[in-house]
């Protein structure tokens, strides 16, 4: 029994596919630090010679990106040699790579000229080896469009496997996506990122999924929603010291799962970087509306009890923010009566001060007055059904959202508040088994699952990292509570 490596099979297929016309092949010129667009029929090979001036060896990064293709087409193959292929084949003097998800990359150090071949022979329509050369098994417009690029050191097009686009939350017609931390805290300049969004498993999405590593595929194929349909802005919200770009997507359909891809075009040259896709599902009920960029409760970026027939998203955000700020302002008047600048002997705590108290109160207040809203048909055990009995009564009187389910505030917010503020203010938390479960939720250790609400809780944070932060705060607060409050 004989076993053949994929590399050997590619060589055999390449040898078979080009020997029929190798000696009469025409080589198209490709200059270093340039790109060229090409079209190739199924079962065909295209040839290029890469040249540059001088007798200098360069580290050449060669990329082949599939831009558009016919249904059923497999990925292309890329070959490079320092000999013409009629000379290279007998000497086995060439390098091969097969495209993966629409992108093939070869790094090679060499002198001018280098010889390149792009082949479509390795596809599901490849004829039997005993079929007459040049005979095709499929009729029709079997054309693949591609981009071939040759750069120095750094490839023109590349795929970055690090996840960099995250879904924060959705409502029944919108979604909020956010990038990871950028390299600056500058928020006045919006970077050049682009997004492409389609219903998962749709025709458009299947195309992007097949060529999910190819930059030109995103720019050459249609998309249901893209950067032109999104409200783009910058934010400092969330973890990390740097700015992030956020995309507010409108006009989505209820109860639909979407896949979004983030790409970053190069500045000053063709090509760009593609990042992994992210999926999200819009809510079913219009009782939840997505709000973000609040002035006071600035970490709020999630769906809240709403009513789109009475409030736009921006008006709803302003109403909630004003409610929270009004309570906070009154609280500061009371806190001003506390001798915050007292000596350590007369201070209310050796561990906490009035700034800690104010910050803990703000975090607790924003999560309590601005509930996180979930679909009425979501049967998750950590959700609480609300029907004209919202934790903040004015929600039912003014917003009138109708029935919805709430993600309760995290219990550690209450413990932090009680342990950070003077006892004279009277903050107390319900005990487990005596009302805590009906007022507060607990942090989950499942990645991406938000089982309780707190400022800054994000879908993209790993459950373990969030759990560590939350339980550290919880532990310190609980010890204080046991020693000094109960």
From Swiss-Prot:
Q: Which UniProt keywords apply?
A: Calcium, Calcium channel, Calcium transport, Cell membrane, Glycoprotein, Ion channel, Ion transport, Membrane, Signal, Transmembrane, Transmembrane helix, Transport
Transmembrane listed as a keyword? yes
**Protein's UniProt keywords contain Cell membrane:** yes
Q: GO: which molecular function terms?
A: calcium channel activity
Q: What membrane topology does the annotation report for this chain?
A: Single-pass membrane protein
Give ranges for the Extracellular compartment. Answer: 25-464
Q: What this chain does, per the record?
A: Calcium-permeable, cation-selective stretch-activated channel (SAC) that functions together with CCH1 to mediate calcium entry into cells. Required during mating.
Q: What is this protein called?
A: Stretch-activated cation channel yam8
